[in-house]
From Swiss-Prot:
SUPFAM superfamilies: DNA/RNA polymerases. The gene is pol. Gene3D superfamilies: 3.30.70.270. It comes from Drosophila melanogaster. The keyword Zinc applies. This is Retrovirus-related Pol polyprotein from type-2 retrotransposable element R2DM. Residues 173-195 are annotated as: Disordered. Its EC number is 3.4.23.-, 2.7.7.49. A zinc finger (C2H2-type) spans 61-84.
Amino acid sequence: FERKNFSDGLVPQRKFIHIGTTSTNNEPRIPLHNLMTTRPSVDIFPEDQYEPNAAATLSRVPCTVCGRSFNSKRGLGVHMRSRHPDELDEERRRVDIKARWSDEEKWMMARKEVELTANGCKHINKQLAVYFANRSVEAIKKLRQRGDYKEKIEQIRGQSALAPEVANLTIRRRPSRSEQDHQVTTSETTPITPFEQSNREILRTLRGYSPVECHSKWRAQELQTIIDRAHLEGKETTLQCLSLYLLGIFPAQGVRHTLTRPPRRPRNRRESRRQQYAVVQRNWDKHKGRCIKSLLNGTDESVMPSQEIMVPYWREVMTQPSPSSCSGEVIQMDHSLERVWSAITEQDLRASRVSLSSSPGPDGITPKSAREVPSGIMLRIMNLILWCGNLPHSIRLARTVFIPKTVTAKRPQDFRPISVPSVLVRQLNAILATRLNSSINWDPRQRGFLPTDGCADNATIVDLVLRHSHKHFRSCYIANLDVSKAFDSLSHASIYDTLRAYGAPKGFVDYVQNTYEGGGTSLNGDGWSSEEFVPARGVKQGDPLSPILFNLVMDRLLRTLPSEIGAKVGNAITNAAAFADDLVLFAETRMGLQVLLDKTLDFLSIVGLKLNADKCFTVGIKGQPKQKCTVLEAQSFYVGSSEIPSLKRTDEWKYLGINFTATGRVRCNPAEDIGPKLQRLTKAPLKPQQRLFALRTVLIPQLYHKLALGSVAIGVLRKTDKLIRYYVRRWLNLPLDVPIAFVHAPPKSGGLGIPSLRWVAPMLRLRRLSNIKWPHLTQNEVASSFLEAEKQRARDRLLAEQNELLSRPAIEKYWANKLYLSVDGSGLREGGHYGPQHGWVSQPTRLLTGKEYMDGIRLRINALPTKSRTTRGRHELERQCRAGCDAPETTNHIMQKCYRSHGRRVARHNCVVNRIKRGLEERGCVVIVEPSLQCESGLNKPDLVALRQNHIDVIDTQIVTDGHSMDDAHQRKINRYDRPDIRTELRRRFEAAGDIEFHSATLNWRGIWSGQSVKRLIAKGLLSKYDSHIISVQVMRGSLGCFKQFMYLSGFSRDWT
């Protein structure tokens, strides 16, 4: 190679012709080797600004947005993409002069042409040009001449000929009871309808039940009389009798409103802290989850408005008139829904029990009292209600309570109304909802309230559509819609009409109509209750049947959307993703998205719902394949006359709890979410064990959804784990060199059980991706390859030392092995053989104070401040025992050998013996403590001899060091007493002819049981699991007593911690 010299110190530049960022030419990037210059182009730098000694400065490319300069256009492009993506979109955007026809536009124009032709319009080209304003008449004319377009016309006409006629399904006025009585029908002239047949089957089932043998308070004979006379008395009279019967077995109690006396004003800070601690502990005892969430969310500043404000507002919302009719196509189902309205079985009752923690309705029937009803009685009650097609008057009324949507809720609209009907109504509606849900062929685009991971399905679909559009430079237009008060505004007429359209049984439709038109509610607030009224619209949030009814209406909406409009993903088209009222629309063109918006708005207005245009937004991605890029363009979309906001590339938005931008999922930082909550948990008046419980069961699981479906880097997960471990060490006062594995290993293996997000997050993502079900994208190669790539990436993140941690047990085993390999955690190796002994670590029981729990954890991990522990790594310092023993001062030495702690060791041993003795006496055994057995081998004194049913059980207790196998120590103890001379002496002394068995209660000084020892004692009925847990705590306390005694006698009278 030849070196060339250039004057004035200038560096030669190689010129390129660029595409994509600034050049509008379509030529490829070609290096021009012959164009070697020594000064910049005149077009870029004027001559009067050029100086020979400033060539290095003049060769840099400046950024027009922030003024920063770069050495090359490539560097400027990287800078623009990372720092100014919105400005880069403006720079890249090009105007289409002769854009290609997309498949979506062809379908829309073909459908419009069929519509215009059917209406007898002439001059079709000019008419179509009005609707397709961005196309010229000549372009429309040429497209209509193409063969593929003509095929679409024929296909649409064929579909129109085969499609059923659209029927106006108007809700007619129901005939009154007198009008129904005057209608004369005879079985000879009128065929039996399915409704009558199902009623006969239900009544036949009621009569076929065998007599119930139960307590007299359930009045089985009175209920049987109601059933026997039902066909004679009629449904109204039967309902009245059933209502009186329910009042008899469930006396009206109502809901108690307890008024708490406000605490007196504290005199000082100490008394204020004590009052706060008392309030938190009282709430903790009532409901741990609610107490923890209230502490994590910070100060609840929500204030419910007064009754004078809440009642008029919500009464107006619930009683506003809604549309009385709904028009649409009748949905053709593959199978009948008659099973929904059939006799209830005992299996249905067991599967639909109301949770014991659920609140009672206005009738005062609690879930516990409902479960006490014999199944035979409950079956008769439920099936009688089915036969009558209506609820008894005593359980029709519901109460409506309000829960704040945010911690700053102060206006009536900031609260969510929750309906609380009777427990019996909830159980019956849960059965009907389960039957209806399993009988409907749901549209695959609706994933809410279904037995599937709908959040994962829809969030991943949105991510797939966005990333696929950018990867293949395809246009995509997305609209995220917000339905205003969807559950509170749905028209009742649309519910009845939709049920009929889906082929629901007449009895079920009548039941729903009767419960909505005849069931009232009262609004309940802070110490007040309004008068009863009947809502005219909306579904009852809190009722098990309401989500299914709402889903049916939204499912009907999805079926009305044009199938040819949507974002193309491989060989499939998807145009919507719905999760209850959270609706996202996709289209390939701007006009297509506007058509979907118009269709959605028309349907929602019919069913009484409205879109909140201010909370809706659109994302417009324009593909530019020639430039090999996509740009975000702000297009105008309308909901009625209101324009929807359009987002830019950098704008973030949330869908189903996951943050997105126009390019896909946004990288999240869980440390930012969990940091403030960890601080609140630190300041909260809780014990250390309560803080750990809150962290393990509530705070960390709150991150799982975002970590599993969002985007997060491994480094961020490690930093979050580090932050969590910092607070754990702070709460427990642990030294910094405590093994990391001790924090993350499960309690059953000896650790604290704090989940490690570094491993749990990829595992959860892999699990949720594996459970994704896309029925409409099953055969789609693009969707399948996208899912497989995401799952493989999650698997790669779960690779640890040639092992794949694909499940939670694998992760727990990984941390347990790392704990046992550490010096301080090796003594916990045998802790995994028996789980209940670790209950005090994972559950915040009242057995231990906060101080005792902290000391117990330090004892467990060998973190007590002995000389060997505090001088670790500094061998030149003195490490001998302070009591003068010829041994290093280790925790094991103090607990097991040092003479200063001998008295406490004896007390620790006796405490275990006394606990076992008490449990044996409670089981009816005769227990002798330390009997003296004079045998040939000498004097033997086992700790306990238990006599039961002419059998003898000998139990000896030992607390051993943790350096050896405890199972071997257990077996040595048994062999110590299981000898012929001792057996002979036992039979002679206690005159027992039965079997003689020898056992040991073997633990180490950390409170860990020998697996063989504790399992044998429990299997023989000599020890309960609860007692084994208590003994483990007592051993731990006794070991702490040994250490305190040693430190006290060593001159440490102050607190050694």
